[in-house]
Amino acid sequence: MRTKQILLAVLLVGSAVSLGGCVVAAVGAGAAGTVAYLKGDLEAVESRKLDEVHAATLKAVKELGLNVTKDSKDALSATVVARDAQDKKITITLRATTEQTTKLSIRVGLFGSEAKSRLIYQKIHDHLQK
């Protein structure tokens, strides 16, 4: 499990370096998994089951006062679509990569907002720690 996280971190950093200018990558260790902001999407990996990450996502969205317009989930993936006070569309996509690991993708608006994406991710991550 730990080997997979390290490999994923190396791949994300390698991708970020090879793609150049408009990429900001941050690689965390331990429970935080890996996080990268790439082309308007914040992508992260959490060492938690899809159901847990989905529940944390809904709590985070509610805590931030976002209006959920779509919430769909099956055994392998989930999508939460919300709108903020400026009516920007926020799409949070979750994919189970293993039984115990979930990949998140957060996009705010058409072009993305790194600051808002990171805030949403941090709230989701905080709820996973409770």
Region roles according to the model:
Residues M1, G21-V23:
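Absolute protein N-terminus
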Residues M1-L8:
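Bacterial N-terminal signal peptides that target proteins for export
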Residues L8, V17-G21:
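C-terminal motif of bacterial Sec signal peptides marking the signal peptidase cleavage site
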Residues V13-G14:
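Repetitive helical segments and hydrophobic/amphipathic motifs
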Residues V23-K130:
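Ser/Thr-rich, low-complexity intrinsically disordered terminal regions
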